[in-house]
Amino acid sequence: MDAREMKIKAAEAALAHVESGMRLGIGTGSTAEEFVRLLAEKVAGGFRVEGVPTSERTARLCVELGVPLKSLDELPALDLTIDGADEVDQALRLIKGGGGALLREKIVAAASERMIVIADESKLVETLGAFALPIEVNPFGLVSTRIAIEKVAARLGLSGELDLRQSGDGEFTTDGGHHIIDASFGRIPDAEALSSELNSIPGVVEHGLFINMAALAIIAGPAGARTLQANR
């Protein structure tokens, strides 16, 4: 079973948690896109949902496949969000934002009764941090914000490259008009402390640590999909 087949298995298992009539947050990324394709097949057969996308990319795919969409202002309280992750640990702490949509992903997840994470088994880790942590920053005062991030990291015993994410024509810009610094710390032993410290930096708009947000993780491997439950 290749990586895409595992993503499809995870998406299929997540779809079983979606009930007709739900207000649904729809994530961003390759695994979330497999979920959208499966959801669209059910919608074509008469299944009713109203989706709130977490990125313009997801919105375009939903429109293309016929999944009905609303804005979060139109549906400010959601039943469920299904989204992928770049890393997930056994406590269901996540690193997200590889696709650049972390701010909207976090806003939508926070507006949901439940969040289910779907991933292939390569994303399940013992300790977060091998995947570079995306930190969404305001373009104004970027150098000062970068220095503040370096100081926070040093206080917590973390070090590594802080790379301003690039796209084909310069700095990557999020749907909200911000930039992303990818912090390669290698290992984050205290994700809660780092989250709190990053939140205290004025130039940091949001970061990719999702803590106490996911209720369930569906992890797919060659033997099929298994479920991890949040212990809180």
Curated annotation (Swiss-Prot):
<comment type="subunit">
    <text>Homodimer.</text>
</comment>
<comment type="function">
    <text>Catalyzes the reversible conversion of ribose-5-phosphate to ribulose 5-phosphate.</text>
</comment>
<dbReference type="InterPro" id="IPR004788">
    <property type="entry name" value="Ribose5P_isomerase_type_A"/>
</dbReference>
<feature type="binding site">
    <location>
        <begin position="96"/>
        <end position="99"/>
    </location>
    <ligand>
        <name>substrate</name>
    </ligand>
</feature>
<protein>
    <recommendedName>
        <fullName>Ribose-5-phosphate isomerase A</fullName>
        <ecNumber>5.3.1.6</ecNumber>
    </recommendedName>
</protein>
<keyword id="KW-0413">Isomerase</keyword>
<dbReference type="GO" id="GO:0004751">
    <property type="term" value="F:ribose-5-phosphate isomerase activity"/>
</dbReference>
<comment type="similarity">
    <text>Belongs to the ribose 5-phosphate isomerase family.</text>
</comment>
<feature type="binding site">
    <location>
        <position position="123"/>
    </location>
    <ligand>
        <name>substrate</name>
    </ligand>
</feature>
<dbReference type="InterPro" id="IPR050262">
    <property type="entry name" value="Ribose-5P_isomerase"/>
</dbReference>
<comment type="pathway">
    <text>Carbohydrate degradation; pentose phosphate pathway; D-ribose 5-phosphate from D-ribulose 5-phosphate (non-oxidative stage): step 1/1.</text>
</comment>
<feature type="binding site">
    <location>
        <begin position="28"/>
        <end position="31"/>
    </location>
    <ligand>
        <name>substrate</name>
    </ligand>
</feature>
<dbReference type="InterPro" id="IPR037171">
    <property type="entry name" value="NagB/RpiA_transferase-like"/>
</dbReference>
<dbReference type="GO" id="GO:0009052">
    <property type="term" value="P:pentose-phosphate shunt, non-oxidative branch"/>
</dbReference>
<feature type="active site" description="Proton acceptor">
    <location>
        <position position="105"/>
    </location>
</feature>
<dbReference type="Pfam" id="PF06026">
    <property type="entry name" value="Rib_5-P_isom_A"/>
</dbReference>
<feature type="binding site">
    <location>
        <begin position="83"/>
        <end position="86"/>
    </location>
    <ligand>
        <name>substrate</name>
    </ligand>
</feature>
<dbReference type="InterPro" id="IPR020672">
    <property type="entry name" value="Ribose5P_isomerase_typA_subgr"/>
</dbReference>
